[in-house]
Curated annotation (Swiss-Prot):
Residues 1-17 form the signal peptide. It comes from the Eukaryota. The lineage of its organism: Eukaryota, Metazoa, Ecdysozoa, Arthropoda, Chelicerata. InterPro entries: CNTX. This is Delta-ctenitoxin-Pn2a. Keywords: Disulfide bond, Ion channel impairing toxin, Knottin, Neurotoxin, Pharmaceutical, Secreted, Signal, Toxin, Voltage-gated sodium channel impairing toxin.
Amino acid sequence: MKVAILFLSILVLAVASESIEESRDDFAVEELGRATCAGQDQPCKETCDCCGERGECVCGGPCICRQGYFWIAWYKLANCKK
């Protein structure tokens, strides 16, 4: 009985570990895509979605990713949509 409980515990841990590893791989791919997009001089999108909420949309230029307050980025984004 103890052997069966030990075996089932190991099996549950193995399945949980595999699930966590798959989630980690998905997250790494997503982060890599975001970092790559932010490092390139791409045309400014209306939503600046490449930069997330920290984007400053420069009209006629690339989407510049920088740290800052959300409402400043939103104001810059609104000016670009004119």
